[in-house]
Amino acid sequence: MRKLDEQREVLYVIRTLDVLMSSGVGLEAAIHTIGSGGYGIISEDFSSMMKRLRKGNSRGLGPELKGLMSKADSEGYRRLLNTMYTNVTQNTDIIETIRKQGTR
């Protein structure tokens, strides 16, 4: 069930991230927006991650994304999380990478 929900929603999440971040919204704000709802299990994952970050019950965004990668069941969602993690740890061009993922 989780895998099916991830597969169904990941393309919409990718497109939303593309639009938000191309408009100048930062990664954390984009994650917060997606966590607000409308994207199934991915919204739940992002919402709980942001709650832990806000409460200080986390070691940071990078480790949180790494944890979600091990929890992800679908390849597309895992790839998106890996892209986000790489951007946080190595400061890569996330917008271009997300656009490429959205066209696959």
Give the label of every model feature segment.
Residues 62-88, 93, 98:
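Hydrophobic alpha-helical transmembrane segments
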Residues 1-12, 73, 89, 93-96, ...:
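Hydrophobic alpha-helical signal-anchor/transmembrane segments
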Residues 1-66, 79:
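Juxtamembrane/interface alpha-helical elements of multi-pass membrane proteins
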